[in-house]
């Protein structure tokens, strides 16, 4: 189980990313439209003004049961070992066990 403070920090980053998403998107569109280098530098300065944690690259996908940041399956939103436990308990329909 991940520490609760790490999970809360991740939620805070998600809220910040949603808040500044439109600003980042509009600034990136402006950069592509402007042809002069000085104009691009000005817009680049605007892109650097939002907080670092508002960047989408800083978000982690976490298991929604345990909060584990690694080994997650996007389709289920679960980490690998939780996914395996759910498969064995027949809580996720349509999955078959592999045996070799």
From Swiss-Prot:
SUPFAM superfamilies: Glucocorticoid receptor-like (DNA-binding domain). It is found in: Plastid, Chloroplast. GO terms for cellular component: chloroplast; small ribosomal subunit. InterPro entries: Ribosomal_uS14, Ribosomal_uS14_bac/plastid, Ribosomal_uS14_CS. Keywords: Chloroplast, Plastid, Ribonucleoprotein, Ribosomal protein, RNA-binding, rRNA-binding. The keyword rRNA-binding applies. GO terms for biological process: translation. The keyword Membrane does not apply. Residues 1-54 are annotated as: Disordered. Its main location: plastid. One of its GO terms (molecular function) is structural constituent of ribosome. Belongs to the universal ribosomal protein uS14 family. PANTHER family: 30S RIBOSOMAL PROTEIN S14, SMALL RIBOSOMAL SUBUNIT PROTEIN US14M. Binds 16S rRNA, required for the assembly of 30S particles. Part of the 30S ribosomal subunit. This is Small ribosomal subunit protein uS14c. It comes from Piper cenocladum. The gene is rps14.
